[in-house]
C-alpha cells in the first residue's frame, strides 16, 4: 500500500508512511519529544532512534508490536547522541539482542552526558530561573535506572545495511 506523506496526520503514535516504513510521532515535537522510525523487511526491522526515557520507549515499542511481532527489531540506528534519540536503547539493544549503530562522533558524545547527569542536574539548586528552565525541559522525563549501552558498530561517512533483504543506506551529515 502506497502512502502519501501529506496524508499522514501529525498525531501521537505509529503511522505507516510508505510500504513497511513507519513514523512514530510525539506531537508537539518540542524539546525531548522526539520522533522515531521503523523500517520493516521480510523478516526483521530497523528502528531509527529510541526515546528520552524507558517508559516512553516502552510505550513506543508496544505500539510497534503489531509490526515487530512478525518483523523483530534487530538493528537500532541512533541518528545522534542527544538523549531523546538514544536513552531508550537498553530496551532493544544489549541483552535484548538488537545491534546498535551510530556514527563515530555520536558514539563519543553518548559517553559524555549519561542519563545520570541529567538526573543529578534536576536535583541541584541552581536558582529559581535555571531550576524552572530545567524542570520545563526535563521534568516530564524519568532518567533514573537508565543504563545506556555502547554502540555495537560505528561508522563515518556512509554505511549500507542489509535489513532482512532490504537495503538501508546510512549517511552521516
Q: PLM features: residue spans?
A:
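Active-site metal-binding loops of divalent metal-dependent hydrolases
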Residues: 27, 50-51, 80-81, 105-106
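Residue-level marker for the onset of beta-strands and adjacent loop->beta junctions
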Residues: 10-11, 34-35, 157
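A mature extracytoplasmic/lumenal domain signature
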Residues: 52, 104, 165-167
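Active-site metal-binding motif and surrounding structural segment of the metallo-beta-lactamase
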Residues: 43-44, 55-102
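N-terminal amphipathic/basic leader segments beginning at the initiator methionine
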Residues: 1-21
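Metallo-beta-lactamase
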Residues: 16-17, 108-172
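Conserved beta-strand hairpin/beta-sheet module of binuclear metal-dependent hydrolase folds
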Residues: 15-68
Amino acid at each position: 500500500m502506497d502512502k502519501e506523506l501529506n496524508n499522514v496526520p501529525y498525531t501521537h503514535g505509529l503511522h505507516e508512511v510508505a510500504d513497511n516504513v513507519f513514523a512514530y510521532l510525539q506531537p508537539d515535537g518540542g524539546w525531548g519529544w522526539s520522533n522515531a522510525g521503523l523500517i520493516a523487511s521480510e523478516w526483521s526491522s530497523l528502528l531509527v532512534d529510541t526515546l528520552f526515557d524507558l517508559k516512553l520507549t516502552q510505550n513506543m515499542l508496544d505500539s510497534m508490536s503489531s509490526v515487530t511481532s512478525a518483523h523483530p527489531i534487530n538493528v537500532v540506528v541512533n541518528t545522534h547522541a542527544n538523549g531523546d534519540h538514544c536513552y531508550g536503547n537498553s530496551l532493544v539493544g544489549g541483552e535484548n539482542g538488537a545491534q546498535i549503530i551510530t556514527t563515530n562522533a555520536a558514539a563519543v558524545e553518548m559517553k559524555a552526558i549519561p542519563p545520570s547527569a541529567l538526573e543529578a542536574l534536576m536535583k541541584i539548586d541552581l536558582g529559581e530561573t535555571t531550576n524552572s528552565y530545567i524542570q520545563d525541559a526535563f521534568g516530564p522525563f524519568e532518567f533514573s535506572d537508565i543504563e545506556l549501552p555502547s554502540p555495537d558498530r560505528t561508522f563515518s561517512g556512509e554505511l549500507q545495511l542489509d535489513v532482512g533483504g532490504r537495503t538501508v543506506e546510512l549517511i552521516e551529515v
